[in-house]
Structures are given as structure tokens and as C-alpha cells.
Amino acid sequence: MKYRFIATLHNMKLSNVKNKGTEIFPGARISNGSKSISDTLDTNLVRHTMGSITSESIKNSTYVYIDGEFEDIHNIEQMDKVGTQRTFSFLRQIEHFTHELWKVKDNNVYVIDGYLFAYNKHFEDGYTYKASLTGLYSYSTYEQNESCFSDSQLTTAIQNFVPLSKDEFNEENFGGKHPDVDILLKNKGSKRMLRALYFTVGARSSSVMPRKIVNYCNALECLFTTGKSEVNHKIAERVAIMLGTTFESKKNLFQLVKKAYNFRSEMVHGQALKAKEEDLVIVSQGLDNVLRELIVENHGVFSKDDKEMDDFFLDLLFS
């Protein structure tokens, strides 16, 4: 059966109109023009299943659409067994792309609903499936503006995007509906960088600033912790010497992380925060920038064992 998948990229604005769309990966395009999908949305199938309100909102948004064919599915009985599951797999793939957009810059782009239309010869004779996610990503500052991406910024995200393998989606996780916890388990080969990404995503989906900071701190611990003593001091020191280029920048980074951990300590122990809202915003934004730089660079030291990491940072400290 042939298919078309559509999902809105909420809060995303492109600097130019892209009617046909720009290819993200084979079969998938990002667009902000209605011409690409008008043949889909202006049909009775869409009106009766998706509804006119949702249809019109997609036309006026930035969205992703994916065209292809399920070579292993030939009739509605087969499609009904896996339709929702495959809708989730497409939706998770686009959510994965939003993480690449974050690597370009801080933003509040997210996906919620995805629609899959499956058909044989004629679209009107097809069937509709829907999947929904709950992660609403926000700016590190929690500002409420749209995120505008230039052509060069979009190109950077697309060039660096590596689609998830089909092996990531199976019956056990229902096409990605149920997140996999293996990345957190040591006996499943958990890796520092993947855990850091996990908590960074948690920070981006937090709507309360102190919770963002807690998750950002967890992400830093995933990358830098090698023991249980003086954790926050070691992390502040290691962030400073790894990213700082001058005495002043190293000092500022050290103070940023120390301040973040003061907020984190009060938050996780249920205390009232002794902070002004503007201070929380500055720290949250600073941590977001730090993690973006660390994750994008993906230094080889983060794949080393604890002793090798300790030796690396000791050498860096006294170099």
C-alpha cells in the first residue's frame, strides 16, 4: 500500500516559503507551503477523519510530509494491524529531527500529532491513522516566541541528521510509542552521551524553570561524573577547563555550574528557592548553551572509562 504521513512542526517558522519542501531524508520533506499537501488535505477522506480545523491548521504551518509504499502490506486487514504502530514510528522519527534543530540553536519546536494515510490506487479510498506524543519543548528561557530558522540553519540540521534505524521501532515498543529505557541501564550498554541527551530532552520538555535546571544538571553528571565525592565541584571544574578559552570565560563557566547546583540542591530537597526568576533564566540558558556545545562536539573522552577520564581532566587542568 502507498502512504503519506503528515505532522506539524509547532512553533517553527522558515525564512522562505518552500512549496515543494526541502528533503530531510529520502521520501521526507519539510515545507511551509500548502501546495505540497493540498491534494491530500482537500479530500473527503481528510474532512471525515482529520477534520477541517486540523486540516486548515496544517496548511498554515511548517510541517513534514513523508511519501512511500509499504511493500509488505497489500490490504486493509494487514494495514489495520500495524497502522497506528507505523504512525508512531514516523512521528518519533520527526521528533528525532527536532533534536537536531536544537543542536543548531535553542528553540521551542515540537511535534504532537501525526497522521498516516494509507491507500492503494486512489487516495479517497484510503484509511487514516493517528498517533500523538506529549513532549512540548520550550526555550531554555521559556520565552513564548516562534523559532525562525534560516535556510543555512535548516541545511545544517538536515546535513547532520541521521534517521533512526528501523530496528528502533518494533512491536515491543509499539513503533516507538513506549520509550526504551535501555539507554539508562548499565547491563544494556548505557553510554554517557545518550544519557546526557535523554536528560537534555527532559529539560527541554519541562515547563517549570527549576525543573529544567535539575535536568540540565543531570545531563552534565552523565558526561562528567566519575565518582561520588565532590560531584558538583568536579563538574564545574571540568566544564570550565574543557570549554573555557580565557581566564574570564573559565571563571564564568565554573560559577554558572556552581550556581546551578545550588538551585538544584534546593529543588530536589523540596526547599523554597532562594532565587530571583531572572537568575533562574540566566542559569537555564547558560546550561543549555553548555550542553549544546558538549553534545555537538561529542568529545572522545566521553566514551572513556572513569580512570581514563580522570587522567584526561587532570592533564587538562595542569596543561
Name each region found by the language model:
Residues 196, 200, 217-220, 239, ...:
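Short alpha-helical scaffolding segments that buttress acidic/His motifs in well-ordered protein cores
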Residues 216, 232-237, 273, 277-284:
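Composition- and surface-driven signal marking solvent-exposed, interaction-prone regions
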Residues 228, 265-273, 295-303:
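Charged/polar positions within long, soluble alpha-helices
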Residues 193-196, 212-216, 220, 232, ...:
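Short runs of predominantly hydrophobic/aromatic residues within well-ordered alpha helices
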Residues 1-211, 280-282, 288-289, 294-318:
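Charged, non-catalytic interaction/linker regions at domain boundaries
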Residues 198-204, 244-247, 272-277:
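Glycine- and acidic
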Residues 214-251:
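Flexible secondary-structure boundary motifs
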Residues 251-279:
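Histidine-centered, metal-coordinating catalytic motifs and their short helical/loop contexts
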